[in-house]
Amino acid sequence: GAGERVRRRCAAEDAAHRLQRRGRLAGQGRGPGGAILATEELIGELRFFIRQTGPALSPVNAWVLSKSLETLAVRMDRHCSNALAIARRLEGYPGINWVRYPFLESHPQVELARRQMGQGGGLVTFEVNGGSAGGMVFLNGLEMISRSSNLGDTRSIATHPATTTHSRLTEEERERLGITPGTVRLSVGLERVEDILADIDAALGG
């Protein structure tokens, strides 16, 4: 995704980026794409594979991606500032049991996150009281925020991992990953943060 706008520089030689759908480099969910940045040696090995299999972007997708890169910095700053504001507001919120966001002062690894990252990203995870039923009531009560298993769009998207992205796992496996029946993942968009919070508040019955 747009990790280079969030993570601080490190010594990695190779990197793979998701450009569309669940990544924020394009950030508008308009088509698939990926990019590999690597040493000349690795790129040389990949070039043969690419020539044989032909995984090339269509011209229109390449154009959309190139235009999206022009606004990446502005978009990521807004995604991250919105996400931090929402995470802070949801802590102690009636109907919310816990909130996870790497830049929250209450996060057990907040100091590590601050050393490794300049911003906390655009994804906020929290648990709605009432288990799976409570999570579904919340999701069905959303009006502005979209309900989907997609992430990284310009609009805010809420996902219920237990019944979508992680539904094939057993309940025990999900528990080990910290995914409870009431867990909701919120991919925070570019809307006014007050509008996002108002939709969350209404869905929680506030």
Positions of predicted regions on the chain:
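Active-site beta-loop-alpha junctions enriched in small/polar residues
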Residues: 1-2, 23, 104, 129, ...
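Conserved PLP-enzyme active-site core in the AAT-like
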Residues: 1-94
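Positively charged, small/polar-rich N-terminal and surface patches that mediate targeting and assembly
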Residues: 10, 37, 98, 152-153, ...
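Short, flexible turn/loop "capping" segments at secondary-structure junctions
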Residues: 27, 59-61, 116-119, 176-180
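A generic structural signal for well-ordered coil/turn residues at beta-strand boundaries
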Residues: 32, 59, 120-122, 151-154, ...
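Short, well-ordered beta-strand elements within core beta-sheets of diverse protein domains
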Residues: 65-74, 122-129, 185-189
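Conserved small-domain helix->loop->beta segment predominantly found in fold-type I
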Residues: 84-152, 169-171, 175
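PLP-dependent enzyme catalytic core of the Aspartate aminotransferase-like
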Residues: 140, 156-206
